[in-house]
Amino acid sequence: MVQVAVMGAGSWGTTVAKVFADAGNEVRLWARRAEVAEDVRDNHRNSAYLGDIELPAALTGTTDPAEALNGAEIVVLGVPSQSLRENLQNWKDLIGPDASLVSLAKGIEHSSGLRMSQLVSEVADVPSERVAVLTGPNLAREVAQGQPAATVVACTDMDRAKLIQAAVAAPYFRPYTNTDVIGCEIAGTCKNVIALAAGIAAGMGFGDNTAATVITRGLAETTRLALEVGADARTLSGLAGMGDLVATCTSTLSRNRRFGEHLGKGETLEQAAASTKGQVAEGVVSSQSVFELAEKVGVETPITEAVVGVCHEGADVQQIMMGLLGRSKKAE
């Protein structure tokens, strides 16, 4: 049994906390809002994010970071990518000297260009081999319901990856290890952007052929970028690559896809956010960071560029989609 702290009580953070508890560990879930922590602690629910799904008794909630992190051997970071730095600065002195840090966030920090594992290592002042990422085709509600799923625990230290793998292996949740942190993080970031594009296409009324094209060409540009920055090509065809991409681009549970659908129907960013519980999808923020990284290393990412045009430059979705199809012809 391992002592686990999960910092962030959104839908995915709460779900991961549930998985660790179902795997036989004691878990403390830190929530920013008192009513969420109380719901988890007193009712074994997170009604705000997971409805009536019952949470295990081994999982408790708190709003006190010190209480959550006290004695934690595994610290799971479940806050959004663009607020991770600020939160981690507040928590870093409370994290044990030998604790493993696991990032759930998928993104590239816009101000620095850092991947999330790099940001965690820098801000918490820990060596990179103590930082892992958990990523894969893991839609929170399905996992929280106990539906079978697999994931990837990526860490440059394979022994540490195996320790985390053992701790998070629940009867319905199968973790695989990988040492390609770069590939897993680039894939996890880009898939949100591609899912926006898939949603835009669906919102415009296009069908399965278009969806398959967006997904496949999205994987192609993700792979080009990932390889250019040092990833292993095999990662892109695995759970953290193709698996996560397919789930996020096709599922009605995917916030990025749903957000894209609203954009495809002609809504503004503000209207789309209002239609999706007031949240701007992660892919909107990530699209700029991904495009800037791609330009920096000289990689062509036309789908990402199109998403940037729609989300940040006021481009018309019809013109953008037709522009993608009208690009100069080339070999696949």
Swiss-Prot record:
Molecular functions per Gene Ontology: glycerol-3-phosphate dehydrogenase [NAD(P)+] activity; NAD binding
Residues engaged in binding sn-glycerol 3-phosphate: 106, 136, 191, 244, 254-256
Subcellular location(s) of the protein: Cytoplasm
SUPFAM superfamilies, per the entry: 6-phosphogluconate dehydrogenase C-terminal domain-like (SSF48179), NAD(P)-binding Rossmann-fold domains (SSF51735)
GO cellular component: cytosol
Enzyme class: oxidoreductase
Originating organism: Corynebacterium jeikeium (strain K411)
Protein name, as recorded: Glycerol-3-phosphate dehydrogenase [NAD(P)+]
GO BP annotation list: carbohydrate metabolic process; glycerol-3-phosphate biosynthetic process; glycerol-3-phosphate catabolic process; glycerophospholipid metabolic process; phospholipid biosynthetic process
Family named by the database record: Belongs to the NAD-dependent glycerol-3-phosphate dehydrogenase family.
Reaction it catalyzes: sn-glycerol 3-phosphate + NAD(+) = dihydroxyacetone phosphate + NADH + H(+); sn-glycerol 3-phosphate + NADP(+) = dihydroxyacetone phosphate + NADPH + H(+)
Gene name in the database record: gpsA
HAMAP family: NAD_Glyc3P_dehydrog (MF_00394)
Main location: cytoplasm
